[in-house]
């Protein structure tokens, strides 16, 4: 494999890392890893009013959580401004750029007139081939774009892309305060970082055509481009601003495992045969740009739930326990004892089968770690009140079992005997046990729970239900 593949992820720290950005980072990382190349991180922080160190840290932490690790040191675009200005001045010296003295008011008026006529607006600067005015008025630096012909490139996903140069204006390179624009900065940084491949969303297609004009003016070889379809909502519509703003940290806080998000993002626009569950090692081995489709991918909450459940279930119980204990302790306000952790550890295998996420799992696990009195829902309270006579018999019979005989066969035998002797359905006896021991009706196998909680804890909970409720 080539060692010359260098990709990059270049987020703007004006918000948290969201799904679209994370997928872009993932695809660039995978392509570099697959080709034994390098994956670089550039923080495009030139918008100082909206950028912050907190958001930079948030983006890097989210990438690290997803196990998307960049090579070397993160580059801050703001530290390269002098280089960007240098290149703009070089274009001026080579007559590839010019000073534009048109005022903002003049340009806005032109835009309004074009809009009224329903025409595409393209600024035609009167200063393109004129000498500078005598007065010291505000100016910007614009690229001298070709007025005819086409700009075309071979996109790695969509094939040949052609844009008429008549649609491309003389873009601003330096603003009136001498700060570089995004389009110039990106080209210079990608060139200086030796970026070989740029994988990004189709919303950048127009930017690519414009950036190629800068590459041509500088006589630099451009990188290869691969534009990936955008992510749509579950109905196939463009994502709303609310959806776009959901950060990776919010998925983390809702109890989604990083492996699930990784797998979910991977399958958004890329496929390998009919595989749905794909490990990181498999993704690195299989990833190719040829596997990226041309149609927009859709959010699919059910698929994310499926993947998260899968990864929760294949993760060992000790690891999952350590993940949910902080959630439980925050919810209850209590430190969970080692004894209670032991109860929960025994019951995790069953609880994991039913869960969607870690937050849900923590909630479903509460009955294992609660002290008496445990929380009991209204349905369970009704059961306890309606079948007091059964609780009395349950307590008497279960009290006669020794700790060492507290096992599945003996417990089942007692439950069947009570059902038979009282002439009630066995499900009623199960309901009574669930109500008093777990405080809810939708718990896993009550026999398994009783074995996990052990003799003393179960009897204390049944006794509380019998005497207090």
Curated annotation (Swiss-Prot):
List positions binding ATP: 241
Endpoints of the signal sequence = none
Give the enzyme's EC designation.
Answer: 6.1.1.17
Q: Which GO terms describe its biological process?
A: glutamyl-tRNA aminoacylation
Spell out the InterPro entries in the cross-references. aa-tRNA-synth_I_cd-bd, aa-tRNA-synth_I_codon-bd_sub2, aa-tRNA-synth_I_CS, aa_tRNA-synth_I_cd-bd_sf, Glu-tRNA-ligase_bac/mito, Glu/Gln-tRNA-synth, Glu/Gln-tRNA-synth_Ib_cat-dom, GluQ/Sye
Q: Which GO terms describe its cellular component?
A: cytosol
Q: Subcellular location, in the record's words?
A: Cytoplasm
For this UniProt record, give its keywords in alphabetical order, as a comma-separated list.
Answer: Aminoacyl-tRNA synthetase, ATP-binding, Cytoplasm, Ligase, Nucleotide-binding, Protein biosynthesis
**GO: which molecular function terms?**
ATP binding; glutamate-tRNA ligase activity; tRNA binding; zinc ion binding
Q: Please indicate which superkingdom the organism of origin belongs to.
A: Bacteria
UniProt short sequence motif 'HIGH' region, positions renumbered to this chain: 11-21
Reaction catalysed by this enzyme? tRNA(Glu) + L-glutamate + ATP = L-glutamyl-tRNA(Glu) + AMP + diphosphate
Which PROSITE patterns does the entry mention?
A: AA_TRNA_LIGASE_I
Map motif 'KMSKS' region onto the chain: 238-242
- What does this chain do? Catalyzes the attachment of glutamate to tRNA(Glu) in a two-step reaction: glutamate is first activated by ATP to form Glu-AMP and then transferred to the acceptor end of tRNA(Glu).
What family is this protein classified in? Belongs to the class-I aminoacyl-tRNA synthetase family. Glutamate--tRNA ligase type 1 subfamily.
Subunit structure and binding partners: Monomer.
Name of the protein in its database record: Glutamate--tRNA ligase 1
User: What taxonomic lineage is listed for the species of origin?
Assistant: Bacteria, Pseudomonadati, Pseudomonadota, Alphaproteobacteria, Rickettsiales
